Amino acid sequence: MDKTDQTAIDESALVLNRTEKSAEAVLRVASMALSITGLVIMIKNSISNEFGSVSYSNIGAFMYLVSANGVCAAYSLLSALAILALPCPISKVQVRTLFLLDQVVTYVVLAAGAVSAETVYLAYYGNIPITWSSACDSYGSFCHNALISVVFTFVVSLLYMLLSLISSYRLFTRFEAP
């Protein structure tokens, strides 16, 4: 192989690395935007009627959802900037750190979505054996907005599952096991 062939291989690896970094940054920015959307919908979600008033701050699961979406949005922004700013090639410590933090954010957001989905389910359908009736008959728009926020949160968790796969692939294919 002559020097020209080696240069072509190095340049194609650099382009692939830039493409990989750009795609990952786009996924992180998209998850940030969706997290903020879910967070804003839930924060603005309140209703008052003859039965009383309710807002997200009255329900622990929804407060956790707002917190998890806020943490995810902040981490998504910081990690997208870090991905774009990291030198090529990135070190093993940087790859492991991204992998670990991606895993943590994935599970935090997934847990927030799951507990909030259970709360929304109970609000829509109640629990007949213990005589809980549906709350959404009285607070329809609140339930609808909560459901939309939960859907956004699950989409974010899917994006973070994909990002976790990318970071695990990067870690386990490019570096030896610890």
Curated annotation (Swiss-Prot):
Pfam families: CASP_dom (PF04535). This is CASP-like protein 2A2. It is found in: Cell membrane. One of its GO terms (biological process) is floral organ abscission. It is a multi-pass membrane protein. NCBIfam families: A_tha_TIGR01569. Residues 44-69, 118-145 are extracellular. Homodimer and heterodimers. Residues 1-22, 91-96, 167-178 are cytoplasmic. Keywords: Cell membrane, Membrane, Transmembrane, Transmembrane helix. Mostly expressed in flowers and buds and, to a lower extent, in roots and yellow siliques. Localized in the floral organ abscission zone. The lineage of its organism: Eukaryota, Viridiplantae, Streptophyta, Embryophyta, Tracheophyta. The chain crosses the membrane at residues 23-43, 70-90, 97-117, 146-166. GO terms for cellular component: plasma membrane.
